[in-house]
Curated annotation (Swiss-Prot):
It comes from Buchnera aphidicola subsp. Acyrthosiphon pisum (strain APS). Keywords: Ribonucleoprotein, Ribosomal protein. This is Large ribosomal subunit protein uL13. One of its GO terms (molecular function) is structural constituent of ribosome. This protein is one of the early assembly proteins of the 50S ribosomal subunit, although it is not seen to bind rRNA by itself. It is important during the early stages of 50S assembly. Gene3D superfamilies: Ribosomal protein L13. It comes from the Bacteria. GO terms for cellular component: cytosolic large ribosomal subunit. Belongs to the universal ribosomal protein uL13 family.
Length: 142
């Protein structure tokens, strides 16, 4: 008996949407990365991108536990000398709420080309309106 290995041409991808209202950031990001990698499928293969497309709505209503709302700091660098910038979770959620989920999920995906292709299947929106209605996404309960 041989081990079954799926070909990239035979991968079937579905569209799902998740409502992030009152969800904990880390738990949601963990579940999203699990589905983006395709580990919920029986034909999961570590070296292929077998995951599904996921749309996250209401990213501005995500929750964090403890004092992270005040104390969590996001860093980025401009590329110039001394150009390290920081912003707190409260500032980030008010100005760019979709980036909070994107940063959390990106850290849980594999590093490299495969992880980048998985990350491209994540679509995050700060409110209920999204532009992927034509794909007929199904609700994913997380």
């Amino acid at each position: 008996m041989k081990t079954f290995s799926i070909k990239s041409s035979n991968i079937k991808r579905h569209w799902y949407y998740v409502d992030a209202t009152n969800k904990i950031l880390g738990r949601l990001a963990s579940a999203l990365s699990f589905h983006l990698r395709g580990k919920h499928k029986t034909e999961y293969t570590p070296h292929l991108d077998t995951g599904d497309y996921i749309i996250v709505i209401n990213a501005s209503k995500i929750l964090v536990t403890g004092n992270k709302r005040i104390n969590k700091i996001y860093y980025h660098h401009t590329g110039y000398v001394g150009g390290i910038k920081q912003s707190r979770f409260e500032e980030m959620i008010s100005s760019h709420p979709e980036r909070v989920i994107e940063i959390a999920v990106k850290g849980m995906l594999p590093k490299g080309a495969l992880g980048r292709s998985m990350f491209k299947k994540l679509k995050v929106f700060s409110n209920e309106n999204h532009e992927h209605i034509a794909q007929c996404p199904q609700l994913l309960n997380i």
